From Swiss-Prot:
Placement of sequence motif 'HIGH' region: 40-51
Coiled-coil blocks: none
Any Gene Ontology CC annotation: cytosol
UniProt motif 'KMSKS' region: location: 609-613
Gene3D superfamilies assigned to the protein according to its UniProt record, in alphabetical order: HUPs, Isoleucyl-tRNA Synthetase, Domain 1
Keywords per UniProt: Aminoacyl-tRNA synthetase, ATP-binding, Cytoplasm, Ligase, Nucleotide-binding, Protein biosynthesis
InterPro entries: aa-tRNA-synth_I_CS, aa-tRNA-synth_Ia, Leu-tRNA-ligase, Leu_tRNA-synth_edit, M/V/L/I-tRNA-synth_anticd-bd, Methionyl/Leucyl_tRNA_Synth, Rossmann-like_a/b/a_fold, tRNAsynth_Ia_anticodon-bd
Name of the protein in its database record: Leucine--tRNA ligase
Family: Belongs to the class-I aminoacyl-tRNA synthetase family.
One of the GO biological process terms: leucyl-tRNA aminoacylation
Organism for this UniProt entry: Lactococcus lactis subsp. cremoris (strain SK11)
Lineage, top ranks: Bacteria, Bacillati, Bacillota, Bacilli, Lactobacillales
C-alpha cells in the first residue's frame, strides 16, 4: 500500500471524531486512569515542537490504558487569561476575548492534527464565565475562612506593564520576567492568600506523592522550614527592643553587630540625628530594588549605620545597629544578628565596614575567609567544646530560662500576592462599601462577569483598567449604601490551581464538580509538564486542593499522585567568536561549515532553547505536512529519555519516517499466515513483554527500540503469523495511531483499534527451544550446530560425533566431554 500520511491521518482523525472514540469511559466495573497535561496558554505563536513531547507521552499512556481495560480521562483545555492578550488589546484596540478565541482555535487545530486522543467534551477555558464562576466561588471560600485578606504591601511594580508582579516573576537583575522592564518597590493595597497557614502540610504531604525527588526538594526549599529561636535585643539607652529569628542561637557569642531591614518600624525611632540623612538616602535607594536583587549573594554589600547600639543578651556586649538591604522586612522579623565569622553575607558586610569578626566555632582563619563548617565551640563561655546540635539545644534552654528568647519554627514561604492591576483576568467578587465594610458576592450572584469594553487603558491611579468602567464599578445596596467593586483581578495562576477538577464534571451548573465523580477520578494518576512549573503552579494547586479538602469538596489530600517533567527540545543555534548568538536567517551553510551572511565569520553550531528571536522555532504544522503526525510522535519519543533535553534533528525525523515505512513494507511484503512455524515466537513475546513494561515505566525510547527489533526479525523469517502481525500493530498504535489503524484494517480487522484488548505474552516462549553448541576436536572448533535445548550428555555426544564424523575417521577417541547447551569436545589420539 502507498503510505500517504496526509490522507491516512485525515481519514482516521475524522473516524475518531465521528465515532467519539475518546469519550471518557463510565463503566463502574473498570479501573480508572486520569492522564493530565499542563494545559497551555494559547499564544498567538501557536504550538512549537516542544509542546507535543509531553502531550504525546500522556497520549501514549492513555491509549495503552484504554487497551488494558481502563476508563481513561484524558482532557485538554486553555489557560487563557494572561497579560499578552491584554497588551495586544491595548496596542490594537481589539477585544482580548476575540484574540484569545482565535488563538484557541489555532491551538486546537494543531493539537488535533497530531492525533491526540483527548475527550473534547471536557474542554475547559479559564476565561469562560461558566468556568471562572467556580474560580470566584473558591475565592469566596478562602475569604470566608480568613485565608484571603487585604494588606498594604510593598509590591514589585512595573510601570511599563501597569501592574505589580510576584517575587517569582522578577529576574535576578531586578527586571520583569515579561518584557525585561525595571521593577520598583511600591506600597499598594493588595489581596493576599494565606498559603503560610498550610506550610507544614505542604511540606509533610510531599512524602505521599510519586514525584521526582529534585522537584520535591525545590518545593521543600521554597517552603524553607527553619527551626531556631526568637531572640530579644534591647536598644542601648532606650526602652526599645527588637526581635531576631536565628537558626543558630549557638553562635550568639559571635554576634558583633545587628542589621535591620530598611523598612523596619524601629529605624526612625533609633536613628541618631547625625545619621538621619545617610539612613534616609539609603532607604530611598533600597526601595527601588526587588527582593531578588537585594538578596543576590553576588552583589556588593551596602548599608548605613543608625548611630544606635543593641545589647547582646547572652554576654551584655554592645553591638552597632546598621540598616542594610540584604535583610528583608518580610523574612523573620526583618532583623538579623550578624555573626560575620560564620556567615558569608555578614562576613562580606563586616569587611566592607570594618566591623569586628569574632570566631565562635573552631576551624579556619576568619580574618582571611568566612568559616561555615562545623566544629567545637570556642569563645562561648558555657557552650565551649560542644558540637553544633548540643550547643543549639543548650543555647535555647538558656534563652528560655532567662526569658530573652524562645524556640521557634519559621518558614521562608511568604503569603501569596493574589491581585493584579489588569483587565484580562477573573474579577475578584468583593464589594467595598462606603461604610468601610467589604462583602463577598453570594454564590447565586456568581459569576461576576468581566465587563466587555473596547477601550482597555491604564487607570492612571495604579488600579486596573476596570476602574475606568464606572457603570460596572459602582453599586448601591438595598439600604442605599454605595459601594465599589474590587478593581484588581486574579493572577493567571488562579484558574490553573484547580482546572483539573473541572475536567471531571465540566458542565455542572450546581457545583464545581459532582462529589461522587471527584471520589471516582481523584487523584490525577499522571501529570506531565515542564519543570519550570516545579514550584509555583504545583505549590499553588496543592494549596487550593488542601483548602478544598478541608471544606469537604475533594476527597484526597493531594491532587497529583505522579508527576513527570519532560525535558526540553532544543533548537539549533549559532555563536560567533564572542559567544554571541546569531539568528538562523543570518547563517549560511557552505563547505561543511556555518558562516555569518553579513560578516563572513565562521560560526560554531550549538543547541539552544528555541526562541522567536533566534528564528530557530520548528513549527509542528510543517513537520506534519512533510513527514506526518505519526513520524513526529515516534521521533519525539525515540530521541532519548523523556526527561532529557535533546537537540532537534532533521536526520532523526527522517529516521523515524523510515522506520514507519519499514513497518508498512513488513505488513505489505511478509507472507502473513494463520500458521505459525515458531520462528518469531521468542522475539514476538519478548516484544509484547518489553514494550508493556517500558510503557509502565515511561521508557518510550526503549519501547520503540524493541518494536524495531521485531521488524528486523521479520525480515529473516519465512512467515509472519497473523496473530503476531495484529499484536505488533496494537503495540505500535499508542505511538503511531493513524498508521496503526490503517494497518489494522488492512490485516482484515474491524475499524477501530483503540479498545481492542492489549496483547499478552507467553512466558514459556521467552525461552529459546533451540541452542547453538560448538563441537571441538582436541579443543579446536570444528563445527557449530543448532540442537534442541537441554539434551542429555549421551544424546549430545552422539550428535557431536555425527557432526564431525569425517574429521574423526582413522582417529582413536580417548574421551568425550559434553557440556549441555554449550559444547562437545572430543579428545583423540
Amino acid at each position: 500500500m502507498e503510505y500517504n500520511h496526509q490522507e491516512i491521518e485525515a481519514k482516521w482523525q475524522k473516524f475518531w471524531a465521528d465515532n467519539q472514540t475518546f469519550r471518557t469511559g463510565t463503566d463502574k466495573t473498570k479501573p480508572k486512569f486520569y492522564a493530565l497535561d499542563m494545559f497551555p496558554y494559547p499564544s498567538g505563536a501557536g504550538l512549537h515542537v516542544g509542546h507535543p513531547e509531553g502531550y504525546t507521552a500522556t497520549d501514549i499512556l492513555s491509549r495503552y490504558k484504554r487497551a488494558q481495560g481502563f476508563n481513561v480521562l484524558h482532557p485538554m483545555g486553555w489557560d487563557a487569561f494572561g497579560l499578552p492578550a491584554e497588551q495586544y488589546a491595548m496596542d490594537t484596540g481589539n477585544d482580548p476575548a476575540e484574540f484569545t478565541a482565535e488563538n484557541i482555535a489555532n491551538f486546537k487545530r494543531q493539537i488535533n492534527s497530531l492525533g491526540f486522543s483527548y475527550d473534547w467534551e471536557r474542554e475547559v477555558n479559564t476565561t469562560d464565565p461558566n468556568f471562572y464562576k467556580w474560580t470566584q466561588w473558591i475565592f469566596t471560600k478562602l475569604y470566608e475562612k480568613g485565608l484571603a485578606y487585604e494588606a498594604e504591601v510593598a509590591v514589585n511594580w512595573v510601570e511599563e506593564l501597569g501592574t505589580a508582579i510576584a517575587n517569582e516573576e522578577v529576574l535576578p537583575d531586578g527586571t520583569s520576567e515579561r518584557g525585561g522592564y525595571p521593577v520598583v518597590r511600591k506600597p499598594m493595597r493588595q489581596w493576599m492568600l494565606k498559603i503560610t497557614a498550610y506550610a507544614e502540610r505542604l511540606l509533610e504531604d510531599l512524602e505521599e506523592v510519586d514525584w521526582p525527588e529534585s522537584i520535591k526538594e525545590m518545593q521543600r526549599n521554597w517552603i524553607g522550614k527553619s527551626v531556631g529561636a526568637d531572640v530579644t535585643f534591647k536598644v542601648e539607652g532606650t526602652d526599645k527592643s527588637f526581635e531576631v529569628f536565628t537558626t543558630r542561637p549557638d553562635t550568639l557569642f559571635g554576634a558583633t553587630y545587628a542589621v535591620l531591614a530598611p523598612e523596619h518600624d524601629l529605624v526612625d525611632a533609633i536613628t541618631t540625628p547625625e545619621q538621619v540623612q545617610a539612613v534616609a538616602d539609603y532607604r530611598r535607594q533600597a526601595s527601588l530594588k526587588s527582593d531578588l536583587a537585594r538578596t543576590d549573594l553576588a552583589k556588593e554589600k551596602t548599608g548605613a549605620f543608625t548611630g544606635a547600639y543593641a545589647i547582646n543578651p547572652i554576654n551584655g556586649r554592645k553591638m552597632p545597629i546598621w540598616v542594610a538591604d540584604y535583610v528583608l522586612a518580610s523574612y523573620g522579623h526583618g532583623a538579623v544578628m550578624a555573626v560575620p565569622a560564620h556567615d558569608e553575607r555578614d562576613w562580606e558586610f563586616a569587611k566592607v565596614y570594618g566591623l569586628e569578626i569574632l570566631p565562635v566555632v573552631e576551624g579556619g582563619n576568619v580574618e582571611e575567609a568566612v568559616y561555615t563548617e562545623d566544629g567545637p565551640h570556642i569563645n562561648s563561655e558555657f557552650l565551649n567544646g560542644l558540637d553544633k546540635a548540643q550547643a543549639i539545644e543548650k543555647a535555647i534552654e538558656f534563652l528560655e530560662e532567662k526569658k530573652i528568647g524562645k524556640k521557634k519554627i519559621t518558614y521562608r514561604l511568604r503569603d501569596w500576592l493574589f491581585s493584579r492591576q489588569r483587565y484580562w483576568g477573573e474579577p475578584i467578587p468583593i464589594i467595598h462599601w462606603e461604610d468601610g465594610t467589604s462583602t463577598a458576592l453570594p454564590e447565586n450572584e456568581l459569576p461576576l462577569v468581566l465587563p466587555v469594553t473596547s477601550d482597555i487603558k491604564p487607570s492612571g491611579t495604579g488600579e486596573s483598567p476596570l476602574a475606568n468602567l464606572t457603570d460596572w464599578l459602582e453599586v448601591t445596596r438595598e439600604d442605599g449604601v454605595k459601594g465599589r467593586r474590587e478593581t484588581n483581578t486574579m493572577p493567571q495562576w488562579a484558574g490553573s490551581s484547580w482546572y483539573y477538577l473541572r475536567y471531571i464534571d465540566p458542565h455542572n451548573t450546581e457545583a464545581l464538580a459532582d462529589p461522587e465523580l471527584l471520589k471516582e477520578w481523584l487523584p490525577v494518576d499522571i501529570y506531565v509538564g515542564g519543570a519550570e512549573h516545579a514550584v509555583l503552579h504545583l505549590l499553588y494547586a496543592r494549596f487550593w486542593h488542601k483548602v478544598l479538602y478541608d471544606l469537604g469538596v475533594v476527597p484526597t489530600k493531594e491532587p497529583f499522585q505522579k508527576l513527570f517533567n519532560q525535558g526540553m527540545i532544543l533548537g539549533t543555534s549559532y555563536r560567533d567568536h564572542r559567544g554571541a548568538l546569531v539568528a538562523t536567517d543570518k547563517v549560511e551553510k557552505r563547505d561543511g561549515g556555518f558562516y555569518h551572511m553579513e560578516t563572513g565569520e565562521e560560526l560554531e553550531q550549538a543547541p539552544a532553547k528555541m526562541s522567536k528571536s533566534l528564528k530557530n522555532v520548528v513549527n509542528p504544522d510543517d513537520v506534519v505536512e512533510h513527514y506526518g503526525a505519526d513520524t513526529l510522535r515516534v521521533y519525539e519519543m525515540f530521541m532519548g529519555p523523556l526527561d532529557a533535553s535533546i537537540p532537534w534533528s532533521e536526520e532523526g525525523l527522517e529516521g523515524a519516517r523510515k522506520f514507519l515505512d519499514r513497518v508498512v513494507r513488513m505488513i505489505d511484503n511478509s507472507e502473513i499466515s494463520d500458521k505459525n512455524n515458531g520462528e518469531l515466537d521468542k522475539v514476538y513475546n519478548e516484544t509484547v513483554k518489553n514494550v508493556s513494561e517500558r510503557l509502565d515505566l515511561m521508557y518510550f525510547n526503549t519501547a520503540i527500540s524493541q518494536l524495531m527489533i521485531f521488524v528486523n526479525a521479520t525480515n529473516k523469517a519465512k512467515i509472519l503469523p497473523l496473530e503476531y502481525a495484529n499484536g505488533f500493530v496494537q503495540l505500535l498504535a499508542p505511538f503511531a495511531p493513524h498508521i496503526a489503524e490503517e494497518l489494522w484494517v488492512k490485516l482484515g480487522n474491524e475499524a477501530g483499534i483503540s479498545y481492542v484488548a492489549w496483547p499478552t505474552f507467553d512466558e514459556s516462549k521467552l525461552v529459546e527451544s533451540e541452542v547453538e553448541i560448538v563441537v571441538q576436536i582436541n579443543g579446536k572448533l570444528k563445527a557449530k550446530i543448532k540442537i534442541a535445548k537441554d539434551l542429555g550428555r549421551d544424546e549430545l555426544e552422539k550428535i557431536g560425533r555425527e557432526a564431525v564424523a569425517e574429521a574423526l575417521e582413522g582417529k582413536n577417541v580417548v574421551k568425550v566431554i559434553a557440556v549441555p547447551n554449550k559444547l562437545v569436545n572430543i579428545v583423540v589420539k
